[in-house]
């Protein structure tokens, strides 16, 4: 019934693009930079892509050691759009981090060494959704206390987006802080057996892009990253689409942290310097946007609905 109501409401109101001030036929693209704050290289590449490329927003990992650096940039560039990359895992073998919340409040979130679990399934197997909620709230509050004008939230490695109980906590945070969220596509949710989620969340007044592109690079060392992303952008539909990248450069630091440094470096180049991508976006009349317009619209609409 809730889904049906949400569907009727969606059919009666203008599209998200129109509510943002565009035409229903316009193609709006959010290129979000995941993993800001993770390390120095990630910060440098993310900010350069925001300044020179098509990235219009990025999400920050508040538990990570290089969080203060990205905070400094965000505060000195208030026009830039930053959200929180809710981080409930610490996946790199030689570079780890713990929780923002006190460990006694989230014991199930931490391994024997006091770090966040390396895999999403570890989180589901050891932590309660309530602990994920506490940790997520602590991370958002940390960003706000640091002076970041938080525009949206998403989930590192999708931890808060792939299990119904954790999705509930994810949405609770969105409602509590009145923030738009990254949301899996309708096709993905249907495959997961939860086709109703988009309708239920929309009924709460929480906004999310019409479409979400999940990055499926099967072999990071051999996949043609540029061809992959050109294909994605070429197929964009009218409305608001989000895709995410992990911007990086081939630094010794990034090479020491992750085996995906090549993919991260290539994604940075494609969305910052690549002439073919620039031409394609111009030819397709695609408008890059960030999440801040969605946040402002959401807060306006939810206030009007009271």
Give, region by region, the residue ranges found by the protein language model.
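Catalytic domains of cell-wall/extracellular-matrix polysaccharide-remodeling enzymes
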Residues: 129-207, 212, 219-222, 234
């Amino acid at each position: 019934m809730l889904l049906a109501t949400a569907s009727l409401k969606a059919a009666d109101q203008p599209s998200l693009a129109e509510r943002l001030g565009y035409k229903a036929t316009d193609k709006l693209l959010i290129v979000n930079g995941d993993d800001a704050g993770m390390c120095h290289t990630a910060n440098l590449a993310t900010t350069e892509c925001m300044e020179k490329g098509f990235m219009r927003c990025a999400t920050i990992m508040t538990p990570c050691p290089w969080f203060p650096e990205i905070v400094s940039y965000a505060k000195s560039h208030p026009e830039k759009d930053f959200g929180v990359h809710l981080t409930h895992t610490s996946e790199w073998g030689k570079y780890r981090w713990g929780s923002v919340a006190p460990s006694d409040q989230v014991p199930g979130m931490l391994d024997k060494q006091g770090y966040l679990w390396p895999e999403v399934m570890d989180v589901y197997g050891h932590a309660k959704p309530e602990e994920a909620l506490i940790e997520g709230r602590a991370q958002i509050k940390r960003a706000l206390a640091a002076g970041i004008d938080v525009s949206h939230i998403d989930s590192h490695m999708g931890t808060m987006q792939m299990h119904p109980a954790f999705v509930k906590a994810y949405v609770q945070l969105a409602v509590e802080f009145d923030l738009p969220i990254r949301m899996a596509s309708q096709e993905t949710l249907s495959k997961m057996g939860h086709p109703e989620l988009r309708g239920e969340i929309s009924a709460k007044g929480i906004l999310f892009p019409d479409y979400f592109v999940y990055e499926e690079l099967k072999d990071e060392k051999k996949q043609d990253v540029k061809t992959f992303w050109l294909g994605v952008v070429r197929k964009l539909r009218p409305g608001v689409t989000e895709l995410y990248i992990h911007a990086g450069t081939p630094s010794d630091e990034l090479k020491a942290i992750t085996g995906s440094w090549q993919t991260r470096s290539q994604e940075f180049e494609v969305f910052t310097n690549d002439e073919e991508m620039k031409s394609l976006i111009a030819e397709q009349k695609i408008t890059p946007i960030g999440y801040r317009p969605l946040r402002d619209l959401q807060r306006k609409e939810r206030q009007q609905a009271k």
